């Protein structure tokens, strides 16, 4: 797969020098994983995902995203549509943008800074 057609890029070493991002995922889609988690009755989906130009969206030019979904409360259809539109298709966020309830997507640096300060996992409300 060429880099131009790839839905993700690897991180430039300078971007996250000294950071442990070993559990990041690089793949074409997070949607099959989320559906699998729903079908298996899991309580939540939590992952770090590397995507390309999520720039100019809610993700603040971030290539590494932290995704957390409370699968016991979040609406599956709404979550999957959100992931498809704003994460995978990298659509621009308009005035009508609303992140689904019980879903959280953050740039890695925001996640990292919160955890360093508060020492806990960030979960959606």
Curated annotation (Swiss-Prot):
Name recorded for this polypeptide: Uncharacterized protein C3G6.07
Domain of life: Eukaryota
Species this protein is from: Schizosaccharomyces pombe (strain 972 / ATCC 24843) (Fission yeast)
GO annotation, cellular component aspect: cytosol; nucleus
